[in-house]
C-alpha cells in the first residue's frame, strides 16, 4: 500500500534559480538557452541544410553541431573549411528561426593517423602536454576512450601552455565571427579520468608548475602531500586546479563576446556535486558564474548510468544533483545530457526515454535526447518527437523563471565538499533527500546566494569549512529572524542561542545510510525529528507518496507544482513508474480557484477543489512519470 506523507510544504527544487531576484538582486533575463530541446548532428561542408530541415521536422530547438576545430590538430592548424561549414549552418538555422551551437574540445586534441601525419601535437609541441608527477605525458591512442580510434594520437594539453592558449583563443574568436549562436566547450579537464591517471592529481608540466609557483610560491612536486586533504598546501593545489578552468572558461567567453556580443558559451561537464569535481578540476558551481549555461553530462559512482539501469535511490540522488545545479545557476539555463538506453533487452528504450525526460523537465532542466553514449541521434525518433512536442507546448510552465515561497534552506558548502567530501556529501545529500521525500519546500543555498536567502530556516549539514564572510552572512540571516539548524560538524563558533538548533548526529548521513540499506523500508518509515523542529509554513502543501518528488514555485505570478514519480521502478526490468493516484494539493485560495493539471505527455485538465475552511483540497488524477499543475485565481 502506498505511503503518503502529510507536510506543511513542498520540496522546492527549482526556485533557487530566481533567488537573486527575490531579495534585492536581478535575475539574468531569459534567452534561447532556457528553451532548448536539443538534438545533435555531425557537420560537414555540405549538410547544413539537411541538418536544419531535420531539426525543424523533429521539433528540435537548439541544434548542436559537431565540427570541432581546436580538438582536432589538423583544423587547429588550419580551420578554414570548418569555419565555412559553421557559418553555413548558422545561416540556415537562423532562416528557420532556430539556434545553433558548435562543439569544441577543451584541453583534448586528437591527431588522426598520427604516425603517418607530418604534424601532431607530440611531434610539434611535446612541452604542451599535461604530465604526471613522474613526468609521464598525457598521450593516448585507440582503446583509451570510445571516441579515440586506433592509430590516432590523443593528448591532453596544459591550459597554461601559453602558445597553445593564444592560438586556441584566436580560434574561438574566429568561430564567434561565423555568426553561430553558441560555443559548446567539452572536457575542459585535468587528465585524471583515464585508466592509470585517476590518482595523478595532474598536471605537473613545466607551464603548470610555474603558474602554481607564481601564485603560491610552492613547488607542487615537493611541497604537497598529494591526496592528503588535511595538508594546507594540497588544499592550495586543489583550489588552484579548480580556479584554472574557471578562468579558462571565463577567457573563452570574453574572447567570443569580443567578436559577437550575444554568443553563448556552454561547457559540458560530467562531475556534478560529488568528489569527482576535485580530481577533474571542473566545478560547475564556479563555472556557472562565468558562462551562459552548463550542459551536464552528469553521472556519479559506478555502473552504466543509463535510465534503464537506475534504482529508485539512483533517481532520487540524481534529483539532488539537479536541484543543486539549478541553485548554482541562479537563473541561467541547465542542460542535461544523460543517457536513456544502450541495448538492454529487458528495458523498452521508449519507456526509458520518457521517464528520463520527465525527471528532468519537472526540475526545470533542458532535456537532450541521445542514443547510447553518443551525442547525436535518438534511441527512438518518434518518441523524441512526442516528448519535444509536449515540452514545446508547455515550455512556459516548465522553463519560465521560478521563485520560492517560504523554503527551508540546505547549505551547499563547496569548500566542505572539496576538502571533506566523505563527511559533507552524505550529510548534504541525505538531508535534501529527507526533505524531498517529506514534501517540504526546500531551497539549496550557496555562498553566492546566502546573503539573499529569505527562507525561515537554514540547515548546515556537516559543514566543516566556513569563511569569515559566510559566518557574517549567517549572523545576518539570524538577525533578520531566520533559524539555523546545525547537524553533525559545527565550525560556526556561534554561542548557544534560541535561533540555533544543534544536533551532534549527522541526520542526513543517517537517512542516506538507511535508504542505501533498504530504500523501500526507509521511505515508508521516515525519521521526521528534524522536520518536526523546523518552522511550519502556511497556505500551501502537497500530500504524496515518498516515492514522488514535488517542487513548488511562483511562475508568471501563479503557484506552480511539479511532480516526478519513481514508484515501482526496478533497474533493468521496469522503468515506467507505478501510477501515483493519491496526491493532494492543499492551498489557501479563493473559493472559485481552480487547478490546471497536465500529466507528462498529456493535456490540460481543470480541477475544482474540495472546500475545507479557507482552504481548497485538490485531488490529483493518477499520473505515472510526472505532472505539472498551476493554481488559477488564488488569493
Q: Would you name each region that the model predicts?
A:
Residues 1-11:
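Bacterial N-terminal signal peptides that target proteins for export
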Residues 9-20:
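Bacterial N-terminal signal peptides
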Residues 26-55:
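Boundary/entry segment of secreted carbohydrate-active catalytic domains
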Residues 34-40, 63-65, 100-103, 183-185, ...:
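Hydrophobic faces of well-ordered beta-strands that scaffold small-molecule active sites
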Residues 45-72, 175-182, 292-294, 356-367, ...:
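Catalytic domains of carbohydrate-active enzymes, especially glycoside hydrolases
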Residues 57-178, 190-194:
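Acidic/aromatic-lined carbohydrate-recognition and catalytic surfaces
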Residues 134-319, 324:
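Polysaccharide-binding and catalytic clefts of secreted carbohydrate-active enzymes
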Residues 246-264, 270-271, 288-635:
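Carbohydrate-binding surfaces of carbohydrate-active enzymes
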Amino acid at each position: 500500500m502506498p505511503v503518503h506523507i502529510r507536510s506543511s510544504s513542498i520540496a522546492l527544487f527549482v526556485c533557487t534559480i530566481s533567488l537573486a531576484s527575490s531579495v534585492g538582486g536581478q535575475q539574468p533575463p531569459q534567452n534561447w538557452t532556457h528553451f532548448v530541446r536539443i538534438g545533435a548532428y555531425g557537420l560537414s561542408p555540405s549538410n547544413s541544410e539537411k541538418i536544419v530541415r531535420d531539426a525543424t521536422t523533429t521539433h528540435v530547438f537548439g541544434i548542436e553541431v559537431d565540427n570541432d576545430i581546436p580538438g582536432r590538430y589538423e583544423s587547429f592548424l588550419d580551420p578554414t573549411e570548418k569555419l565555412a561549414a559553421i557559418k553555413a549552418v548558422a545561416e540556415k538555422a537562423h532562416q528557420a528561426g532556430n539556434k545553433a551551437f558548435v562543439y569544441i574540445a577543451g584541453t583534448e586534441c586528437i591527431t588522426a593517423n598520427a604516425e603517418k601525419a607530418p604534424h601532431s601535437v607530440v611531434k610539434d609541441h611535446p612541452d604542451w602536454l599535461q604530465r604526471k608527477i613522474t613526468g609521464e605525458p598525457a598521450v593516448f591512442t585507440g582503446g583509451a576512450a570510445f571516441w579515440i580510434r586506433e592509430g590516432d594520437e590523443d593528448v591532453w594539453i596544459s591550459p597554461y601552455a601559453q602558445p597553445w592558449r593564444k592560438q586556441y583563443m584566436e580560434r574561438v574568436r574566429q568561430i564567434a565571427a561565423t555568426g553561430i549562436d553558441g560555443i559548446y566547450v567539452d572536457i575542459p579537464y585535468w587528465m585524471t579520468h583515464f585508466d592509470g591517471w585517476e590518482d595523478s592529481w595532474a598536471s605537473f608540466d613545466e607551464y603548470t608548475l610555474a603558474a602554481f609557483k607564481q601564485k603560491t610560491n610552492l613547488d607542487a612536486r615537493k611541497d604537497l602531500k598529494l591526496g592528503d586533504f588535511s595538508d594546507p598546501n594540497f588544499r592550495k593545489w586543489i583550489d588552484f586546479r579548480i580556479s584554472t578552468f574557471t578562468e579558462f572558461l571565463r577567457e573563452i567567453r570574453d574572447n567570443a563576446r569580443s567578436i559577437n556580443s550575444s554568443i553563448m558559451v556552454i561547457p559540458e561537464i560530467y562531475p556534478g556535486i560529488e568528489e569527482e569535481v576535485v580530481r577533474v578540476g571542473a566545478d560547475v558551481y564556479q563555472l556557472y558564474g562565468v558562462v551562459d549555461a552548463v550542459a551536464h553530462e552528469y553521472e556519479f559512482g559506478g555502473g552504466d548510468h543509463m535510465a534503464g539501469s537506475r534504482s529508485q535511490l539512483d533517481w532520487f540522488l540524481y534529483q539532488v544533483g539537479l536541484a543543486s545545479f539549478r541553485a548554482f545557476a541562479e537563473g541561467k539555463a541547465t542542460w542535461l545530457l544523460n543517457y536513456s538506453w544502450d541495448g538492454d533487452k529487458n528495458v523498452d528504450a521508449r519507456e526509458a526515454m520518457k521517464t528520463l525526460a520527465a525527471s528532468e523537465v519537472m526540475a526545470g532542466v533542458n532535456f537532450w535526447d541521445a542514443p547510447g553514449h553518443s551525442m547525436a541521434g535518438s534511441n527512438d525518433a518518434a518518441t523524441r518527437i512526442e516528448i519535444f512536442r509536449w515540452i514545446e507546448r508547455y515550455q512556459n510552465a516548465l522553463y519560465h523563471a521560478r521563485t520560492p515561497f517560504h523554503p527551508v534552506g540546505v547549505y551547499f558548502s563547496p569548500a566542505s565538499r572539496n576538502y571533506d567530501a566523505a563527511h559533507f556529501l552524505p550529510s548534504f545529500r541525505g538531508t535534501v533527500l529527507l526533505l524531498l521525500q517529506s514534501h517540504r519546500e526546500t531551497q539549496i543555498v550557496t555562498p553566492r546566494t546566502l546573503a539573499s536567502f529569505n527562507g525561515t530556516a537554514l540547515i548546515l549539514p556537516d559543514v566543516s569549512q566556513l569563511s569569515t564572510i559566510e559566518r557574517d552572512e549567517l549572523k545576518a540571516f539570524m538577525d533578520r529572524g531566520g533559524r539555523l539548524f546545525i547537524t553533525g560538524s559545527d565550525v560556526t563558533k556561534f554561542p548557544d542561542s534560541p535561533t540555533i538548533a544543534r544536533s551532534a548526529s549527522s541526520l542526513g548521513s543517517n537517512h542516506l545510510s538507511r535508504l542505501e540499506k533498504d530504500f523501500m523500508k526507509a521511505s515508508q518509515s521516515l525519521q521526521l525529528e528534524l522536520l518536526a523542529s523546523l518552522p511550519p509554513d502556511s497556505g500551501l502543501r502537497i500530500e504524496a507518496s515518498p516515492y514522488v518528488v514535488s517542487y513548488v514555485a511562483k511562475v508568471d505570478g501563479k503557484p506552480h507544482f511539479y511532480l516526478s514519480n519513481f514508484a515501482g521502478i526496478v533497474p533493468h526490468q521496469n522503468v515506467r513508474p507505478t501510477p501515483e493516484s493519491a496526491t493532494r494539493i492543499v492551498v489557501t485560495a479563493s473559493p472559485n480557484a481552480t487547478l490546471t493539471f497536465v500529466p507528462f505527455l498529456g493535456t490540460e485538465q481543470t480541477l475544482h477543489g474540495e472546500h475545507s475552511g479557507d482552504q481548497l483540497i485538490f485531488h490529483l488524477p493518477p499520473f505515472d512519470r510526472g505532472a505539472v499543475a498551476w493554481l488559477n485565481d488564488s488569493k
